[in-house]
Amino acid sequence: MKFFKTHSDHELKRIKKTVKQILELQPEYAQLSDEQLKSKTEEFKQRLKEESLNDLLPEAYAAIREADKRVLGMEPFPVQIMGGIIMSQGRVAEMCTGEGKTLVCTLPAYLNALTGKGVHVVTVNDYLAKRDSDQMGQVYEWMGLSCGCITQDMEAPDRKVQYAKDITYITNNELGFDYLRDNMAVRKPQMVQRGLHFCIIDEVDSVLIDEARTPLIISGTKFCSKGKYLAFDRFAKMLERGETTELNKIDYISGEMGTDSGDYVADEKDNNLFLTEAGVAKIEEMFHIGNLSDPENLSIQHGMVNALRANALMHKDKDYVVRDDEVLLVDTFTGRIMPGRRFSDGMHQALEAKEGVSIRPENKTLATISFQNFFNKYERKCGMTGTGQTEEQEFRDIYGMDVIHIPTNRPIIRKDLNDSVYKTKAEKYAAIVKRVRKIHKKGQPILVGTETIEVSEILSEMLLKKGIAHNVLNAKNPEMEAAIVAKAGQFGAVTIATNMAGRGTDIKLDSRSKEAGGLYVIGTERSESRRVDNQLRGRSGRQGDPGVSKFFISLEDDLLRLFGSEKYISIFENLGIKDGMPIEHRMLSRSVEKAQKKVEENHFASRKSLLEYDQVNNDQREIIYRERLKVLNGEDIHSDILYMIDSIIDRKVIESYEGNEISAKLLNDNLLPIIPLPTIGDADTKEDDFVKSLHTSAKVLYQKKEALMEQAYPNEHMMREIERTLLLKTVDKYWQQQIDDMDQLRQGIHMVSYGQKDPKLEYRLQGFSMFNAMNDNIQEDTVQLLYQVAPVIHDN
């Protein structure tokens, strides 16, 4: 029972009038012929010249709703119309599994496509992008709009064609990588995107929250010694893992210090790792260095922390799998392998050294962006998900989107049972198998959701021994994914799925399954996120179907082990509970949710911190990409070149002062290698307007160069083209180096906190200084190369 109205209740009340308008138009639109209904698209486009999208919304939604009915045989319900309106307002619509989010998408996609600027519908994998574009594309094209789809294997020319469509279905990864590639193009025709206008993000929490900690990176290889990674790994395995003593508030206020044991502390709660004083001393001894924190030893410190992190915090068959002499990353939120994705900064090499597989060359980052900064580039964005309210603060703070819960079309009748808590994992697994046997006997379909591949394989083996036929869906067999999910709701089906939460396909029940009680969902442990658990529960009870959900957890599970398993152990002991027997109480479930909330807060803080650092990089990236685009668009940059010449002269004159006078020798050494002017004498520097005369002389010299090129290549505007080409190449060369330098700065910036400085402020200040130095280098290299340009003389 609710005593108070929620934010969602208030917002839904506001849009009920619009929903009513749309429903009242239904009889009128139902009487239109197919041709009359199709002609509405062109009518709306013309009206947009005088009216806003908001003015058109009721009629446009009524039109596409009628088209959905005629083409697909599906008409959006009033609650689905609500979801469509919320999304058109640039918000997140939280809609339960099975409530037809794919159909809802047609409403805001159609409306926003009328502008002609393009709509991107973002999905989490190629399969869903292709499936949804094939199905929903029928409606858009029937209404006179074009619809396309971009998948991983598509070549650039085809991508350009698909981006030119009114509505384009694509994954978040492909969208981000195309943006980066476009900003590395050396010719305008190589660019495939046409701007970031409006996007609809399906599974928006997965894209904007779960994947926000992993930036998109385009990389090349850089030379490095493989032996150093093996050395780091060998030394890391020799160091002793310790524990930190947490302080209570009174100790902290009185100035007591926590004590650290061992050589390093790996905190799985916060996914942090740091060296103790003893560990620092051992590393200094191992590598025969004086001070590990000295700038020249930064690579050793970074390599050792990577090796320790690989050994202490990253787990095989959970964070990654080893296959065919290769370490492959696993998306921990979906259980899918991410082919082609590698950690940067030596982290992947640390894992390869740990697992004893071939060590591949380290990546050099050529271009990078976080999903947070990428999606914030859209003029307007919205999203839909089954579970968004637990992350509402993050959506609002980072993306400026609030989350509105849309009621279900039919009431949810699924039973969510209390958690069963066991002492050990072995007891828990035995209890799960026992429960599966019991439920399976009556034919009720069962879905067992696991956090790792390892657990899915343990349970699979146990079920086989009991003679229970089942399907296994994990990161090792993604090809069979859709087929397995399609069968999971059949009578008598048993399915084990690694992190089923992120699968994106509905489980539909047959009639016998409904009679048997619907889908029985078993969670094998609580996830770090309440949202992921809710996604697993939400697989059952779709569209008013019956169903059950229950979590089996143990005191050895990561979440309980890290957040207060001692408390539960004492409860077991005080109650005298025998081995193999569980505790079940709502209080325990609430305690687990409290622990999850703490982890979520830690992750939010981590993502927010990442964004604050990345914002510095983003400000720099914006400037570089804006200047590159000017060049690619064919804008005349001749005036920019002349400005660079003046800037270089001014800078070199300032650098050549000795006391109160300009040193002619220093100025010749500093300036003439860049701008080949006649040698400057001491007397010249004393003249009035000396700097002005240098500006004039340099430009006259440049004009002579231009005249020479014009004579050799008449009517070809050769010098303008050379200016563009050389500037682009120089910008790219130094920008890639800047990315690398900023990354090195980020790795070591925490050391400044020992000097009572704010790391984030120092990162911004030092990054700004490095960016200015990069700009100077770009100017000097570009101008130097332009003065060296000469026509090619061909023998007749």
Map each language-model feature to its residues.
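Conserved P-loop NTPase motor core
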Residues: 1-576, 625-626, 643, 647
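Extended, charged helical/alpha-beta scaffold domains that provide interaction surfaces
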Residues: 321-328, 334-341, 543-544, 556-559, ...
